[in-house]
């Protein structure tokens, strides 16, 4: 008979951001526990609110299946003495297995006889297994923990009640001073204690007591209510899924409502208004059909519609001081100049072991100029880049960013425009933070992209210079995210930058621009290169590239991220070519022999007069044609051209002994192979490819 089981953990209200990951964790842990305990089940439905984590398991088996197990004991020579009597080792072994020496049989393993006992293990009833869920619950981990009373358990919030029902029967267990039963609690203010008669009654019973336990249903209810208000007022709403998720995990019985604020606050920049309402009050902003922000908001109450007018007035009243503060900061910030804000950065620390934020900008400016010149920016772009790099952190010392840190960069762009900076400079001030997450949007402007790369490179070089290198999961300054952002930007723009060479050049440029800072930019250069290679591997992993392709393109002296990314995609595009095995094997044979020859650059010379077979001339002509056509070809076309050399290469190896006794002939042949091997370098170490 299949059973249903309800588990509910009732808690003090949890922070909204931990509700969803917590219920996912509980579901995974319980599923793993049942699997480990050999209890079959069909499905687990997860439910969550700010005050509860619950699972409804369907199709549970009656019991564990019985198990017949053959248990290995000591060797026969240890189990019996010379007269064939059972030793203490044999007697102790059988006693431990709930058997007697009469149950012993011998089995040979690798030429040695061992004692074995056959055991029949009776499966435990499902209720007995479920009673062990207390350990599953208390083993959960959370980003923040707390204790309560005199108890030593660390948990996300105090546990107030537990429900454990197998069909209509309680499966009791204890966590601290709380015993699992059938009593749950409804809405904190609207509900009461609720007795659950049977596991499958759970959702309906709580809905009758003002709790929607199904998070998906609750979210849909919120969206429907908000959309109804939007339609009623002929508004438009930009759905903010992050805010919707947060609000959903703040309420158990949602009731949406609309409020208004004074029209005068619309004079504030939109990001300021939106931040004041969204981040501080969890309000949804609304617009008209022309996209203009309206002096109104939508919020969601954790309760019903009783006295909703008072709730609306209260929310409107709370919003006003927020908007007044924002208006004050905005007005006051415009009474100073950008240069005055920049000067204040001398007293803002980037890191106490590195420099002030002012000095960081000076380093970044030198880096940005060097980078801009290498990437071929126009004179106007270089001028805009220089100006942007001179001011791009200025908004950190404004009152608005001091109050709303999440607006850094955004307010920088707004203020820069108001202070007369051109569009390119203002946009770069905002874009230098991008991407703000691993999959975040990239800068859209050339100047902004160069500044973003330069700023992040400075952070990485600076922290590596003072030996503050990320290790394990420890990365307090988000250097991995910044390096990953650099890789993404370079690959997206197809900007070729040799990171190892650039770091050496950056050291010289920064030391000339800021000689007093004393940072050795070139310190730990190999570690910096490896750091970026690891970020490339991360990128390739997310692109689901084969491991051998990743190994091939990263096992190389090439430190140009854009080139490595392009090479990886070229190899991936050809991985299923019909003739790839023969083609790659021919090229890898060339590479290995060239490496074995180990000729110096000066010794690599091909003399046609030393050719002894037609195939040598054919390969020489083919390689030269390959090199001559290289400039006008894409990387994919270059790789295809290399693969097409396979017949010529194979004939060459058939007709010629590379390691000829004649030193001149040998070196001539090795020179030709070395030149060809050099043409494969752009694709990494082809020897790493697995071809079938």
UniProtKB/Swiss-Prot annotation:
Primary location: cytoplasm
GO molecular function term, any single one: glycine-tRNA ligase activity
Any one biological process term the GO annotation gives: glycyl-tRNA aminoacylation
Catalysed reaction, written as an equation: tRNA(Gly) + glycine + ATP = glycyl-tRNA(Gly) + AMP + diphosphate
PROSITE patterns: AA_TRNA_LIGASE_II_GLYAB
Domain of life, source organism: Bacteria
Keywords for this protein: Aminoacyl-tRNA synthetase, ATP-binding, Cytoplasm, Ligase, Nucleotide-binding, Protein biosynthesis
E.C. code: 6.1.1.14
GO CC list: cytosol
Cell compartment(s), UniProt: Cytoplasm
PANTHER family from the UniProt entry: GLYCINE--TRNA LIGASE, CHLOROPLASTIC_MITOCHONDRIAL 2, GLYCYL-TRNA SYNTHETASE
Oligomer and partners: Tetramer of two alpha and two beta subunits.
HAMAP family according to UniProt: Gly_tRNA_synth_beta (MF_00255)
Record-stated family: Belongs to the class-II aminoacyl-tRNA synthetase family.
Protein name: Glycine--tRNA ligase beta subunit
Lineage: Bacteria, Bacillati, Bacillota, Bacilli, Lactobacillales
Gene it is expressed from: glyS
